[in-house]
Amino acid sequence: DIHFSLTFDEETACIGAPLLIKELKKRKITNGICIVGEPTEMKIIDSHKACDEYTTFFEGLAGHSSKPDEGVNAAEYASKYVNKLMSLRSDLINRKPKDSIFTPSYSTLSIGGIFGGIAHNVIADKCHVNWETRPVNKEDGIFLNSEIDKYAEKLLSEMKKKYPDASIKKKIIGERIGVFRVCR
């Protein structure tokens, strides 16, 4: 049998494929070949990187910008977090597998947005960072999350010295496993 299936909303919420998988299971369709037409422009591929998306929320203490020592600036801590992610991006490049079939050949990392603060003269009490990684292997995803989580604990410790209710919370938006070649 040949089955045609289409998904939707794969660039923003990524909800089409999980719904399709549930439906295929319900109908007991377990075929082993899939052709994905986007973003490859119908070029046949036999593997793809994983895609892990996160939003990290920072909560500090607002105050007037003329008295920075009386607040905990969530935007400043979010900036430190982003800087750490960027340094980890260099590590990911250095960890690239010698036999990688991907372009680029290493796990990628992207900051999709930084949002926080309400005015120039107000210490930002809230900020969040949208970011994603496209690991070429499971180990890179584990490495990246372990390193950034340790760093977030360090930042939170600093924040809590000034404001015990400060918080840093990483929310998983989606973690989609990669598909890797079985044969070369």
Model-inferred region functions:
Residues 1-53:
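Acidic/histidine-rich catalytic neighborhood of metal-dependent amide-processing enzymes
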Residues 55-184:
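Metal-dependent amide/peptide-bond hydrolase catalytic core
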